[in-house]
């Protein structure tokens, strides 16, 4: 159904605008939280929303999905998400293309489609007439772990597909100014304007009574909290180092403090296990006693001598109680894409101490609802000391200011209205002439993707034979021929799209 018909229909017969989301894996994470919040928000504005995904486990998803608040369609879960723990981006792309084919052949009634994380499906969607909005949490090429020469060669076609498919979207939206700057660096040839729609937090959550009560012995301490997954890139070590620096400034009163290190922890993830051990060893180096809690939340016991309390994979109700009872949130990640945790803390009137880079530059107003300081443990320790022992900072007023700031700027309604504005302006921008050009672009891009896929497969297939040829030299000519054929196909694909992009100024 065409966009003109859709808009005309909605304006005359009051039929709601229909919106589809395409998301790879609808689990529990920041990207998934945004999709859920956006879907719920758009529904509250009268839109009909369906989320399409390749995987959704009802035992491991957000409540709005589990209770049916959001309509979810799952297709392609039977396809592998990886092959022997590898080729995950290849499998994810394949699953998304399959999902897109189902959507295009069975669900043609949508007015707009929002794609996030993976953009492989965008060229295929151009074959229809729906407006396409791509939401970039962070460029995938920078998220992927880099390896040796083979990994770099493997990533080339997928990084190229990401760049060329993203540029075909009608609207490109990012989650922060920081991500926008990284996006421009990652894709310098994309000239389309970038819109910013910040993630949101549940404003009503702060007005509800806490469902969990911390033990009195913990509440008697001056609590500082760090909430992050147990990953090195989150730089939790900085919080412990700053806490140690606090002792140098206030040795006599230091026993009054307790550092809470809470976050996502999966024992199956080796990095989680290793990093927790590193942090515990760092506590020992700094002569800080610690206790680790991973269950039995109703009976948390902490000795008076404990300085650091590690809390692994805390339930939401416990997490809310921990944040609400803390004096300061120590938000340690460097160059974080956006950062939801600072918003959650400010909503509960807890000031935030963060680094002078990344997403917090857009959420933390230095001196008003928190502090922005360089990565220096002594500087951080001094801020903690002054905020908790002197009148230098009115932390109560900062907490109130932070709560109002979040309620006004980062509510679900505010985010939904920004999405609605981008969607409606995108729909109106698609003229009949533009629709024809979109389909031409889509056909060409699908052809290039098809060629890239088979060319890459041919090249990949020759690698094991190239190794075998060391023992069976007679097969080398066939291997060489196959490698050359695959290389030619990939090269022609790149050349075709490059020339076309230049001619059409994509």
From Swiss-Prot:
Pfam hit, one: Glycos_transf_1
Enzyme category, top tier: transferase
Annotated glycosylation sites: 299
Superkingdom of the source species: Eukaryota
GO BP field: dolichol-linked oligosaccharide biosynthetic process
Keyword rRNA-binding listed: no
Residue stretches spanning the membrane: 82-104, 118-138, 443-463, 481-501
GO cellular component: cytoplasmic side of endoplasmic reticulum membrane; endomembrane system
Gene3D superfamilies assigned to the protein according to its UniProt record, in alphabetical order: Glycogen Phosphorylase B
Subcellular localization(s) per the UniProt record: Endoplasmic reticulum membrane
Keyword S-adenosyl-L-methionine attributed: no
Catalytic activity: a beta-D-Man-(1->4)-beta-D-GlcNAc-(1->4)-alpha-D-GlcNAc-diphospho-di-trans,poly-cis-dolichol + GDP-alpha-D-mannose = an alpha-D-Man-(1->3)-beta-D-Man-(1->4)-beta-D-GlcNAc-(1->4)-alpha-D-GlcNAc-diphospho-di-trans,poly-cis-dolichol + GDP + H(+); an alpha-D-Man-(1->3)-beta-D-Man-(1->4)-beta-D-GlcNAc-(1->4)-alpha-D-GlcNAc-diphospho-di-trans,poly-cis-dolichol + GDP-alpha-D-mannose = an alpha-D-Man-(1->3)-[alpha-D-Man-(1->6)]-beta-D-Man-(1->4)-beta-D-GlcNAc-(1->4)-alpha-D-GlcNAc-diphospho-di-trans,poly-cis-dolichol + GDP + H(+)
InterPro entries: ALG2, Glyco_trans_1, Glyco_trans_4-like_N
Biological pathway: Protein modification; protein glycosylation
GO molecular function, one term: GDP-Man:Man2GlcNAc2-PP-dolichol alpha-1,6-mannosyltransferase activity
This protein's UniProt keywords: Endoplasmic reticulum, Glycoprotein, Glycosyltransferase, Membrane, Transferase, Transmembrane, Transmembrane helix
Family statement: Belongs to the glycosyltransferase group 1 family. Glycosyltransferase 4 subfamily.
Function: Mannosylates Man(2)GlcNAc(2)-dolichol diphosphate and Man(1)GlcNAc(2)-dolichol diphosphate to form Man(3)GlcNAc(2)-dolichol diphosphate.
Annotated protein name in UniProt: Alpha-1,3/1,6-mannosyltransferase alg2
């Amino acid at each position: 159904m065409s966009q003109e018909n859709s808009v005309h229909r909605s304006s005359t017969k009051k039929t709601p605008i229909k919106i589809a989301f395409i998301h790879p894996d609808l689990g529990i994470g920041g990207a998934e939280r945004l999709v859920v919040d956006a879907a719920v928000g758009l529904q509250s504005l009268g839109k009909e929303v369906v989320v399409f995904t390749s995987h959704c486990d009802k035992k491991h998803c957000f409540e709005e999905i589990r209770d049916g608040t959001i309509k979810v369609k799952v297709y392609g879960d039977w396809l592998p998400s990886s092959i022997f723990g590898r080729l995950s981006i290849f499998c994810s792309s394949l699953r998304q293309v399959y999902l897109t084919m189902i959507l295009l052949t069975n669900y043609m009634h949508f007015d707009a489609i929002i794609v996030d994380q993976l953009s492989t499906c965008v060229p295929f969607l151009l074959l229809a007439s729906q407006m396409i909005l791509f939401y970039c949490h962070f460029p995938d090429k920078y998220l992927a772990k880099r390896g040796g020469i083979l990994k770099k060669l493997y990533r080339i076609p997928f990084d190229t597909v990401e760049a060329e498919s993203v540029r075909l979207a009608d609207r490109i939206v990012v989650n922060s100014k920081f991500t926008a700057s990284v996006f421009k660096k990652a894709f310098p040839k994309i000239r389309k304007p970038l819109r910013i729609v910040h993630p949101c937090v549940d404003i009503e959550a702060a007005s509800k009574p806490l469902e969990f009560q911390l033990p009195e012995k913990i509440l008697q301490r001056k609590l500082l909290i760090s909430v992050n997954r147990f990953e090195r890139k989150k730089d939790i070590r900085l919080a412990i180092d700053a806490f140690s620096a606090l002792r140098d400034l206030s040795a006599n009163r230091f026993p009054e403090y307790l550092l809470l290190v809470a976050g996502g922890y999966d024992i199956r993830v080796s990095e989680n296990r290793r990093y927790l051990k590193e942090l515990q060893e760092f506590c020992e180096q700094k002569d800080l006693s610690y206790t680790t809690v991973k269950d039995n939340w109703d009976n948390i016991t902490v000795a008076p001598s404990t300085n650091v309390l590690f809390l692994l994979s805390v339930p939401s109700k416990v997490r809310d109680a921990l944040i609400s009872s803390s004096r300061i949130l120590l938000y340690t990640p460097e160059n974080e894409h956006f950062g939801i945790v600072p918003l959650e803390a400010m909503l509960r009137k807890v000031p935030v101490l963060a680094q002078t880079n990344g997403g917090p530059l857009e959420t933390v107003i230095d001196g008003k609802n928190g502090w922005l300081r360089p990565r220096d443990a002594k500087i951080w320790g001094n801020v903690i000391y002054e905020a908790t022992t002197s009148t230098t900072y009115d932390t109560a007023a900062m907490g109130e200011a932070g709560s109002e700031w979040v309620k006004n700027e980062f509510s679900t309604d505010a985010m939904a209205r920004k999405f609605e504005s981008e969607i409606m302006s995108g729909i109106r921008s698609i003229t009949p002439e533009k629709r024809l050009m979109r389909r031409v672009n889509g056909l060409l891009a699908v052809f290039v993707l098809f060629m890239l896929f088979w060319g890459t497969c041919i090249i990949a297939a020759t690698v094991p034979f190239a190794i075998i040829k060391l023992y069976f030299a007679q097969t080398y000519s066939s291997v060489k021929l196959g490698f050359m054929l695959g290389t030619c196909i990939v090269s022609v694909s790149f050349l075709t799209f490059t020339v076309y992009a230049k001619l059409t100024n994509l």
